[in-house]
Amino acid sequence: MADNPLWHETLHDHFGQYFSVDNVLYHEKTDHQDLIIFDNRAFGRVMALDGVVQTTERDEFIYHEMMTHVPLLAHGNAKHVLIIGGGDGAMLREVSRHRSIETITMVEIDAGVVSFCRQYLPNHSAGAYDDPRFTLVIDDGVNFVNQTTQTFDVIISDCTDPIGPGESLFTSAFYEGCKRCLNPGGVFVAQNGVCFLQQDEAVGSHRKLSHYFRDVSFYQAAIPTYYGGIMTFAWASDNEALRHLSSEIIQARFHKANLTCRYYNPAIHTAAFALPQYLHDALSAP
């Protein structure tokens, strides 16, 4: 490792992580962004944007399995799914494993992201872009959810952190648009950062989402790349019962879907909705 340069993440002040860089595959630094993809011996291929790790080959499966199978199996009868972002294709890969889904729409603001990730992160999409149920829409996510005539059973917001371009996907305008195009009984989920370090983000999302949905909460997963504690995923629906389904129901749906996962299982599904007390306290604070 001493012979390899080190790449340091810059997400948090006074605290962080680094990766040794075995080989830089791509690096573009402009006035608008700093994008790098490199190989790391421990985590495989790593993609970082503006000094923040977005995904790695080693542990991406945890994030993407939890962002897809939790809402889809909780819903139980999703036919039309919307993915906001997700240009690396891994979210599409996991959604497409549910054969009962009829349409998968993905909204990505930059067409170049998709072609770029297909070239440099082919294992993420694993051929899912060729699924005949899939439609790619090049548009801003906020604009799409507020203008589309389509409706969806599950909406997955695969957003970056709420800084720079990703900030719009944490706004009331976005959440209102998602409610607008979500079918009755539908589920909205979104990544919401590591709550121990980014607690204000969770509190802000909870407050805004509560204006549009009757049941707003979070679920969690431990993802090594997103260090600092558990990662939280926002959950919003008008049907609170979907968050409290019995393990027997989830097990039956999991079996029917014929899924084989590396992180997700029905027990993880149920346990994921148990949140630490400090988050409960923050969400209930006046």
UniProtKB/Swiss-Prot annotation:
Please give the pathway this protein is involved in: Amine and polyamine biosynthesis; spermidine biosynthesis; spermidine from putrescine: step 1/1
Instruction: Write down the Pfam families for this protein, in alphabetical order.
Output: Spermine_synt_N, Spermine_synth
In terms of InterPro entries, this protein maps to: PABS (IPR030374), PABS_CS (IPR030373), SAM-dependent_MTases_sf (IPR029063), Spermi_synthase (IPR001045), Spermidine_synt_N (IPR035246), Spermidine_synt_N_sf (IPR037163)
Q: Name one GO cellular component term.
A: cytosol
Lineage, top-rank taxon, reads Bacteria
Cytoplasm among keywords: yes
Query: Which reactions is this enzyme annotated as catalysing?
Result: S-adenosyl 3-(methylsulfanyl)propylamine + putrescine = S-methyl-5'-thioadenosine + spermidine + H(+)
Enumerate the PROSITE patterns for this protein: PABS_1, PABS_2
- Tell me a GO biological process for this protein: spermidine biosynthetic process
- Top-level EC class as recorded in UniProt: transferase
Q: Residue ranges of the PABS domain? A: 5-238
UniProt GO MF annotations: spermidine synthase activity
Q: Which residues does the entry assign to the active site, renumbered to this chain?
A: 158
Q: Which residues bind S-methyl-5'-thioadenosine?
A: 33, 108, 140-141, 165
* Function comment: Catalyzes the irreversible transfer of a propylamine group from the amino donor S-adenosylmethioninamine (decarboxy-AdoMet) to putrescine (1,4-diaminobutane) to yield spermidine.
Q: Which family does it belong to?
A: Belongs to the spermidine/spermine synthase family.
Give the matching PANTHER family: SPERMIDINE SYNTHASE, SPERMIDINE/SPERMINE SYNTHASE
Q: How does it assemble?
A: Homodimer or homotetramer.
- Which protein, by its recorded name, is this? Polyamine aminopropyltransferase
Q: Which organism is it from?
A: Klebsiella pneumoniae (strain 342)
| Gene it is expressed from | speE
